[in-house]
């Protein structure tokens, strides 16, 4: 089973790239972060044409996560952490594979720091 993860930084802006990726690599599951769209504007048809089903926990303009799969996904959970700011950052699901259940956890966690800050931290302290 091939499971991929991709911060797409807007699923609608990258739909051509996503379709090309799915055609070329044919992952069983693709977990996307920062989809930046609500369910109402998610490109379900573009994904379904490639024989994938989509499960979306979206948010307008920011955040948002999705799991797309060739196989049936069960027990989809959205908003499992009660976020008072209502940020769509985590979606979980179960999938059966070879008589076992695999728990998929897709989380969008921005670090909020510039890359130069992280580089300096690693360089000076080894963190």
Where do the model's predicted regions map?
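N-terminal, active-site-proximal structural segment of metallo-dependent hydrolase catalytic domains
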Residues: 1-53, 62-65
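Soluble or luminal CAZymes and related metallo-dependent hydrolases
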Residues: 10-14, 85, 120-122
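Nucleotide phosphate-binding site architecture
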Residues: 12, 74, 125
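Structured beta-strand-rich core segments of catalytic domains in phosphoester-bond hydrolases
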Residues: 35-38, 42-112
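Single conserved hydrophobic/aromatic residue that forms the stacking wall/gate
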Residues: 116-127
């Amino acid at each position: 089973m091939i499971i991929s993860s991709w911060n797409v930084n807007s699923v609608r802006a990258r739909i051509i790239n996503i379709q090309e990726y799915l055609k070329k690599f044919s992952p069983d599951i693709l977990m996307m972060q920062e989809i930046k769209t609500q369910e109402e504007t998610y490109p379900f048809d573009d994904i379904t044409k490639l024989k994938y089903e989509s499960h979306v926990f979206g948010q307008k303009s920011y955040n948002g996560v999705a799991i797309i799969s060739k196989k049936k996904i069960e027990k989809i959970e959205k908003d499992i952490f009660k976020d008072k700011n209502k940020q769509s950052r985590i979606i979980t699901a179960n999938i059966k594979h070879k008589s076992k259940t695999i728990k998929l956890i897709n989380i969008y966690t921005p670090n909020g720091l510039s890359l130069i800050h992280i580089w300096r931290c690693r360089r000076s302290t080894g963190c």
